[in-house]
Amino acid sequence: VAPPPNGSWFRIVDYPPGFPGRRHKTDTIDYAICMSGEINMELDDGIMVHMKAGDVLVQRGTVHSWINKGDETCRIAFILIDAESVGLPHE
């Protein structure tokens, strides 16, 4: 769910062990703060970004999915800030 125009959302999401991920794109500037556990963010070109507790990731308009291959729940705090859509080559 996108934030309102010129607005933002803050949410905390728990990804259980074995979470398979769901590819999606957000039209926002996203800050992801890994609070506990570990997780991989897979980009549409296959690049994997591994995050562990304390790591921070910033992205804008990427196609991605969150995949928890670990044996513990990963908790991530997200801050999503409304932004203009970024056109990607395959759109």
Which sequence ranges carry the predicted segments?
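Glycine- and acidic-residue-biased ligand/ion/polar-headgroup-sensing regions
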Residues: 27-45
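Double-stranded beta-helix
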Residues: 67-91
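Compact, glycine-rich, soluble single-domain proteins
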Residues: 1-2
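Short acidic-glycine-tyrosine-enriched beta hairpin
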Residues: 45-62
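Conserved short histidine dyad/triad with adjacent acidic residue
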Residues: 8-27, 60-63, 82
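Short beta-strand His + acidic residue motifs that chelate non-heme Fe in jelly-roll/DSBH
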Residues: 21-23, 41-42, 64-70
